[in-house]
Amino acid sequence: MTVRNLEFMFSPASIALVGASEKRGSVGRIVASNLRTGGFTGDIQLINPRHATIDGVPCHPSVVALPHAPDLAVVATPPDTVPGVIADLARHGTRAAVVITAGLDADLRQRMLEAARPACLRVLGPNCIGLILPHLGVNASSAHCM
Protein backbone atom coordinates (compact mmCIF):
# COMPACT_ATOMS: atom_id res chain seq x y z
CA MET A 1 0.00 0.00 0.00
CA THR A 2 1.13 3.52 -0.74
CA VAL A 3 0.27 7.00 0.51
CA ARG A 4 -0.13 8.26 -3.05
CA ASN A 5 -2.95 10.81 -3.39
CA LEU A 6 -3.87 10.73 0.31
CA GLU A 7 -3.07 14.44 0.56
CA PHE A 8 -6.14 15.11 -1.60
CA MET A 9 -8.30 13.26 0.94
CA PHE A 10 -6.86 14.86 4.07
CA SER A 11 -5.90 18.33 2.80
CA PRO A 12 -8.26 19.20 -0.07
CA ALA A 13 -8.29 22.62 -1.69
CA SER A 14 -11.61 21.91 -3.42
CA ILE A 15 -14.54 19.60 -2.76
CA ALA A 16 -17.45 18.44 -4.93
CA LEU A 17 -20.63 16.83 -3.63
CA VAL A 18 -22.16 14.40 -6.12
CA GLY A 19 -25.79 13.94 -5.15
CA ALA A 20 -26.45 17.31 -3.55
CA SER A 21 -30.14 17.70 -2.82
CA GLU A 22 -32.84 20.15 -1.79
CA LYS A 23 -34.90 17.40 -0.15
CA ARG A 24 -35.20 18.06 3.57
CA GLY A 25 -33.58 15.30 5.65
CA SER A 26 -31.79 13.68 2.70
CA VAL A 27 -28.12 12.78 2.95
CA GLY A 28 -27.37 15.05 -0.02
CA ARG A 29 -28.93 18.04 1.73
CA ILE A 30 -27.28 17.34 5.09
CA VAL A 31 -23.83 16.99 3.52
CA ALA A 32 -24.33 20.12 1.38
CA SER A 33 -25.32 22.11 4.45
CA ASN A 34 -22.41 20.73 6.50
CA LEU A 35 -19.94 21.60 3.75
CA ARG A 36 -21.24 25.16 3.46
CA THR A 37 -21.35 25.86 7.20
CA GLY A 38 -18.22 24.02 8.37
CA GLY A 39 -15.82 26.88 7.70
CA PHE A 40 -13.99 25.37 4.72
CA THR A 41 -12.44 28.21 2.70
CA GLY A 42 -11.78 26.23 -0.48
CA ASP A 43 -14.00 25.78 -3.51
CA ILE A 44 -17.20 23.77 -2.98
CA GLN A 45 -19.09 22.49 -6.04
CA LEU A 46 -22.49 20.80 -5.99
CA ILE A 47 -23.62 18.24 -8.55
CA ASN A 48 -27.19 17.21 -9.32
CA PRO A 49 -28.67 17.05 -12.85
CA ARG A 50 -32.13 18.16 -11.65
CA HIS A 51 -31.17 21.50 -10.08
CA ALA A 52 -29.55 24.71 -11.33
CA THR A 53 -28.99 25.86 -7.74
CA ILE A 54 -29.39 24.41 -4.27
CA ASP A 55 -29.96 26.95 -1.50
CA GLY A 56 -28.55 29.63 -3.79
CA VAL A 57 -25.38 27.69 -4.60
CA PRO A 58 -24.83 26.88 -8.31
CA CYS A 59 -25.29 23.21 -9.12
CA HIS A 60 -23.62 21.38 -12.02
CA PRO A 61 -25.44 18.65 -13.96
CA SER A 62 -22.57 16.13 -13.89
CA VAL A 63 -18.97 15.49 -12.92
CA VAL A 64 -17.81 16.17 -16.48
CA ALA A 65 -19.56 19.57 -16.40
CA LEU A 66 -17.34 20.78 -13.55
CA PRO A 67 -14.95 23.57 -14.58
CA HIS A 68 -12.07 21.75 -12.86
CA ALA A 69 -11.49 18.48 -11.06
CA PRO A 70 -12.05 18.72 -7.31
CA ASP A 71 -9.34 17.38 -5.01
CA LEU A 72 -11.99 15.50 -3.04
CA ALA A 73 -15.44 14.28 -4.07
CA VAL A 74 -18.19 13.23 -1.69
CA VAL A 75 -20.60 10.73 -3.25
CA ALA A 76 -24.18 10.46 -2.00
CA THR A 77 -25.97 8.86 -4.94
CA PRO A 78 -27.96 5.62 -5.33
CA PRO A 79 -25.83 2.46 -5.07
CA ASP A 80 -26.13 1.44 -8.73
CA THR A 81 -24.69 4.80 -9.85
CA VAL A 82 -21.57 4.76 -7.68
CA PRO A 83 -19.19 2.85 -10.03
CA GLY A 84 -20.05 5.22 -12.89
CA VAL A 85 -19.63 8.29 -10.69
CA ILE A 86 -16.22 7.06 -9.53
CA ALA A 87 -15.22 6.36 -13.16
CA ASP A 88 -16.27 9.90 -14.16
CA LEU A 89 -14.35 11.40 -11.24
CA ALA A 90 -11.23 9.39 -12.12
CA ARG A 91 -11.39 10.45 -15.78
CA HIS A 92 -11.93 14.09 -14.76
CA GLY A 93 -8.80 14.06 -12.56
CA THR A 94 -10.19 13.77 -9.03
CA ARG A 95 -7.82 11.88 -6.76
CA ALA A 96 -9.90 11.15 -3.63
CA ALA A 97 -13.52 10.30 -2.90
CA VAL A 98 -15.66 9.69 0.17
CA VAL A 99 -18.54 7.36 -0.69
CA ILE A 100 -21.31 7.84 1.85
CA THR A 101 -23.74 5.72 -0.16
CA ALA A 102 -24.82 2.51 1.57
CA GLY A 103 -26.23 -0.64 0.01
CA LEU A 104 -23.46 -1.53 -2.43
CA ASP A 105 -23.30 -5.29 -2.88
CA ALA A 106 -20.00 -7.08 -3.49
CA ASP A 107 -20.25 -6.63 -7.27
CA LEU A 108 -20.90 -2.88 -7.05
CA ARG A 109 -18.06 -2.43 -4.53
CA GLN A 110 -15.69 -4.30 -6.83
CA ARG A 111 -16.77 -2.24 -9.86
CA MET A 112 -16.30 0.96 -7.82
CA LEU A 113 -12.75 -0.05 -6.87
CA GLU A 114 -11.93 -1.11 -10.44
CA ALA A 115 -13.11 2.31 -11.68
CA ALA A 116 -10.86 4.05 -9.13
CA ARG A 117 -7.74 1.94 -9.65
CA PRO A 118 -6.42 3.25 -13.03
CA ALA A 119 -6.27 6.83 -11.69
CA CYS A 120 -5.10 5.82 -8.19
CA LEU A 121 -8.23 7.53 -6.90
CA ARG A 122 -8.38 6.95 -3.14
CA VAL A 123 -11.77 5.83 -1.81
CA LEU A 124 -13.11 6.06 1.74
CA GLY A 125 -16.29 4.01 2.06
CA PRO A 126 -18.79 3.00 0.91
CA ASN A 127 -21.35 3.09 3.71
CA CYS A 128 -19.53 5.60 5.86
CA ILE A 129 -20.62 8.71 7.74
CA GLY A 130 -18.21 10.85 5.72
CA LEU A 131 -15.06 12.76 6.57
CA ILE A 132 -14.53 15.55 9.09
CA LEU A 133 -11.31 17.58 9.14
CA PRO A 134 -11.80 20.20 11.88
CA HIS A 135 -8.45 21.91 11.29
CA LEU A 136 -9.61 22.75 7.73
CA GLY A 137 -13.27 23.42 8.51
CA VAL A 138 -14.28 20.41 6.42
CA ASN A 139 -17.47 18.66 7.47
CA ALA A 140 -18.07 16.33 4.54
CA SER A 141 -20.31 14.09 6.59
CA SER A 142 -23.93 13.14 7.00
CA ALA A 143 -23.79 13.83 10.74
CA HIS A 144 -26.31 16.41 11.91
CA CYS A 145 -24.72 19.44 13.54
CA MET A 146 -25.78 20.02 17.12
Predicted regions and their residues:
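Catalytic-core regions of core metabolic enzymes
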Residues: 1-146
